[in-house]
Amino acid sequence: MNNALKNTLGLFNLNRIDRDLFSWTGESVGFQRIFGGQIMAQCLVAGYETVEKARMVHSFHSYFLRPGDFDQDIIFEVDRIRDGKSFTTRRVTAIQNGEAIFS
């Protein structure tokens, strides 16, 4: 596996802090802001870590609230809204400096 692929996959390695709390420590790669697709994917990973592995993503809605900064840790807070027989619902908020940057 080449370094670019390893670095890209490393973006999705979140650290579990608590049952519904994850973090990611970034490092500057020369961009001013974090790419929105990265935050979306990381939120998806955080939410997926809180559901049964047999569950698949059915729907994903998101809001970009503020620009993300590579030099700041991101906290992913998962809200377990519903665990039903057919569907599981999660809300994931990405937070930097105490403010939501993505939901």
Give residue ranges: language-model regions.
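Terminal targeting signals and extreme-terminal segments of soluble enzymes
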Residues: 1-103
